[in-house]
Amino acid sequence: INPQRKKVFYMKRFEGKFVLITGGGQGIGRGVSNAFAAEGANLIITGRTLSKLERAKEEIEKEYGVKVVPVTADGGDEEQVKNPIATGVKELVRLDAGVNNAQNSASGVNLIDHTKEDFDKAIYSGLYATFFYMKHAFPYLKETKGSVVNFASGAGLFGKLGQSSYAAAKEGIRGMSRVAASEWGPDGVRVNVVCPLAMSEVLAQWKEAYPDLYEKTIQSIPLGHFADPQKDIGRVCVFLASEEASYVTGETITLQGGSGLRP
């Protein structure tokens, strides 16, 4: 992360609005949570570990003065997904946007070495979780003419080594998002995708496990560094969910520092 980044000023575009963020208590998801909170949004944040969610709630509420509702859920379990949506909407009254960020996978494992369990981990935590959250959030988003921002990855766009199950889940999310954009457009609900390349706890672990691949990745980024989760990823999610992007739907935005250059 570049320590010389300029100070960012926020416009409170989401003051009085309510946003659901999966995996919003840590990593890139925490950066997204901070970005929406800085714009005045009240949040429903989900994850598997209550202590991390409660810590994020305390810190976000203290810094930004918004309300945060933490709810534990396994995104791959449809019944559990219903809980954060119902609980959050009950406390916050409405839902204006959903950001599906959470994902688990067996990275660094070649396709021929992948097990069904490896694939299930990626598909259930990513593709199924995104499907379940979209499906059950839609009735509320329809009422507010809301927006969905889903997370995919350069792993699928560019065929990254050792990422077959992760790429499969993420490309499934991209395809599903485009279909949803077509189906939900008449109801005023927009659906877009971001493919981030951001520094996070998971990436730091990957750096430790695969230092040579990490250095090769850094060298392939024209801007020379990974994104800041809040400023570089979260603020784009805010834009896509805001009125400024009211005519943007079904799109994939690559946030790769130039490493995702395409014709």
Where do the protein language model's features map onto the residues?
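Substrate-binding pocket helix/loop in short-chain dehydrogenase/reductase
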Residues: 109-111, 115-123, 217
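Active-site helix of classical SDR
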Residues: 134, 169, 177
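Short C-terminal tail/terminal secondary-structure segment
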Residues: 9, 108, 158, 219, ...
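Residue(s) in the substrate-gating loop at a strand-loop-helix junction
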Residues: 153
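Conserved glycine-rich cofactor-binding loop
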Residues: 18, 25-27
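Short, small/polar-rich loop/turn modules that mediate ligand/substrate recognition or access, typified
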Residues: 185, 190, 248-250
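Catalytic Tyr-x(3-8)-Lys segment
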Residues: 212-231
